[in-house]
Amino acid sequence: MADKGLEDLPEGMIESNYEDVTDSFDSMELKAELLRGVYAYGFERPSAIQQRAIMPIIKGNDVIAQAQSGTGKTATFSISALQKIDPNLKACQALIVAPTRELAQQIQKVVVAIGDFMNINCHACIGGTAIRDDMKALQEGPPIVVGTPGRIQDMIQRRVLKTDQMKLFILDEADEMLSRGFTEQIYDIFQLLPQATQVVLLSATMPQDVLEVTTKFMRDPVRILVKKQELTLEGIKQFYIAVEKEEWKLDTLSDLYETVTITQAVIFCNTRRKVDWLTDKLTARDFTVSAMHGDMEQSQRDIIMKEFRSGSSRVLIATDLLARGIDVQQVSLVINYDLPANRENYIHRIGRGGRFGRKGVAINFVTADDVRMMREIEQFYSTQIEEMPMNVADLI
């Protein structure tokens, strides 16, 4: 079928023309140090966009990916860029442009963290900082440079940011960038790059001006559309237990323990300190629990996760960091020892991917101070959290 113009597609959506999926990082044939960095960063398996977009980028295709934030897109292009560069070549080989300073700095942090074992230097070129500092940093030839369009264009024109070794040009949040009036700078940057530079464009929406960039500057691009997986509270019974004061939560949990271990449960606390404290207290009462949070070494987290997945550990105490990372499809009970500090995390803790259609029970410990937050959560998700019945064990 002839490639139909992207312009004909309905309401700013692109149509995928690439269906290959690589569902583990191990199968991506990444450099050993990079793979180590990916796992150390806390990833266990690739998200939908990572499964689809990393391989074509590594293989050298131009890629258009339509994906919302929260889908794992930053890591998608960071991993790809780290795989493609030669760390020993002191010259810019991958250039990433983002619409805001904050986003550029965030991307830089991700690149440095995932590239930790490759000793990669990644420089952020952003407005509002001294040009002198940029010039000095760029003279050292960092292999990956990330920045905002104005400053990047300026640095290339001054010949401080050299483009002769450039292999990869990544535009993140292209729709944002063009709607903020950076079109001219973006076009200028394209003109200043070597003809053969591979182009990767990421955008949540595909308005006309973004499509024009893809037609003008991209060669036969792979198109990937990733819809954000909708989490749902459907099929999940939500209860609360009124706890007069914080100190009583521990006894409440101990009373529930028999019920809890009928199946596997995840217990969420709001801080790492609380996770450690609760783990100690429960262990002292001879309850078997495992704990996991961001302060732990990745290898340790992997072991705990493996034990939990295999069912040899039944109760996992964790922080929100893991709410998004734990594939808790097999978990039918979640206890919020602390209500989440922000309501968005509530659905990450207890929600389920619609296609799994899993049943489940969530129990929220609620002190007088938490009532307002609970009402907010109910309103935000248009859901009902009811007082826990006596026969909760029958529902799990």
Swiss-Prot record:
Motif DEAD box: chain residues: 172-175
Top enzyme class, one word, equals hydrolase
One GO MF term: ATP binding
Q: What is its main location?
A: cytoplasm
Note the SS bond partners.
Answer: none
* Domain (Helicase C-terminal): residue spans on this chain: 235-396
Q: Name one GO biological process term.
A: cytoplasmic translational initiation
What is written about domains in the entry's comments? The Q motif is unique to and characteristic of the DEAD box family of RNA helicases and controls ATP binding and hydrolysis.
Record family assignment: Belongs to the DEAD box helicase family. eIF4A subfamily.
- Free-text function comment from the UniProt entry: ATP-dependent RNA helicase which is a subunit of the eIF4F complex involved in cap recognition and is required for mRNA binding to ribosome. In the current model of translation initiation, eIF4A unwinds RNA secondary structures in the 5'-UTR of mRNAs which is necessary to allow efficient binding of the small ribosomal subunit, and subsequent scanning for the initiator codon.
According to UniProt, the name of this protein is: ATP-dependent RNA helicase eIF4A
Organism equals Aspergillus terreus (strain NIH 2624 / FGSC A1156)
- Give the gene symbol: tif1
